[in-house]
A protein has these predicted regions:
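Polytopic transmembrane helical bundles with strong interfacial aromatic enrichment
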Residues: 1-206
Length: 206
């Protein structure tokens, strides 16, 4: 579903903003033509291995291998997140001087001013979201379980998910501050536009 949604979104963007998407692909040829497809395929393959290897590894008492597979899956997912944060922040804080953008290397465009702050923010945000998703799934399974043992297990799952979500969410405001501070240091007018101009109501709702 995610792949289909992403493909549809890309198709719409190519039609509606053809010049912009062409420029973005031309600015990050290695990332979009090699890096992103490779990471996406690897992550998908490891995800299927992770899901379908649980029963055989559990029966063979080799849960450690399943944990290692999960760690590899998370590393690939994190790499994909970090890689795509490059073009996202390039649109916000492109390297200066702006008239030399066409002569700047691809890595310099990725490692721009806001790249690492956004990485921090998204890492913490995704960790929080993951914890709460575990909590939601645990609550759903709890409500639909008939056996007492299952209800006790999913009650425990919900508590653990909630604990993870709250614990990881605590530093989220600090990560947001670091990200916005970097934008202000890059160009204060961008920060003013976000915080007190047309985007101010969006920030207030947040």
């Amino acid at each position: 579903f995610t792949a289909l949604t992403g493909g549809l979104f890309l198709f719409v963007m190519l039609i509606a903003y053809e010049d912009f998407i062409t420029y973005l692909f031309a600015s990050f040829p290695t990332l979009f033509m090699v890096g992103y497809p490779t990471l996406f395929i690897l992550e998908t393959a490891v995800m299927y291995i992770y899901v379908y290897s649980w029963d055989p590894l559990n029966k063979a008492n080799k849960k450690g291998r399943h944990i290692v597979t999960g760690v590899i899956l998370n590393i690939l997912g994190l790499s994909l997140l970090v890689a795509l944060d490059g073009p996202a922040t390039f649109m916000q804080t492109p390297p200066k001087p702006l008239n030399e953008l066409m002569n700047i290397g691809e890595w310099a465009k990725i490692a721009n001013s806001a790249w690492m702050p956004l990485n921090y923010h998204r890492l913490v945000g995704n960790g929080t979201f993951g914890g709460y998703m575990v909590c939601v799934i645990g609550a759903y399974m709890y409500l639909w379980s008939d056996k007492k043992e299952d209800r006790e297990y999913y009650d425990w799952v919900g508590y653990i998910g909630n604990l993870i979500g709250v614990a990881i969410m605590l530093p989220l405001p600090a990560m947001g501050y670091i990200f916005v501070r970097e934008i202000y240091q890059y160009d204060a007018t961008i920060g003013m536009y976000i915080m007190s101009d047309r985007e101010s109501m969006f920030m207030l709702v947040q």
